[in-house]
Amino acid sequence: MSVVCVAWSSHVGALMSAASRPGMPSVRVLSSRMLEEPDGVERCLETMRSATALFVFRTTDALWDQLDEGIRLIGKTVPVVCVSYDPAAWALSSVPVETAQTAYRYLTYGGAENLGNLFRFLDALP
């Protein structure tokens, strides 16, 4: 099992690079573009269900609406951090808002060190 991160395709390369660095917890990075594939929503949900912690950088694209209920259900058993440019999407998080804010800062500041810290932070969530 691992931390699962679903993010915009523009972030995937940097996230995957940070996840492959020595000393990182097990991380699966998924591009939100997979949601556009015929079975993408179900494959994404299946991977998210295997997470020990879930980080979602949600867009306002209507495809995400199909994931919302699944994210809520996953949040009943594992920590879910959902961030977005739309503050309403943060309500999908199952963690305190301060936890989501910290994770969002790591992503926003970017760079290998901050993204590595994001993964370690997510991996340490209870």
What are the functions of these language-model segments?
Residues 1-126:
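An N-terminal assembly and electron-transfer interface module characteristic of large anaerobic redox
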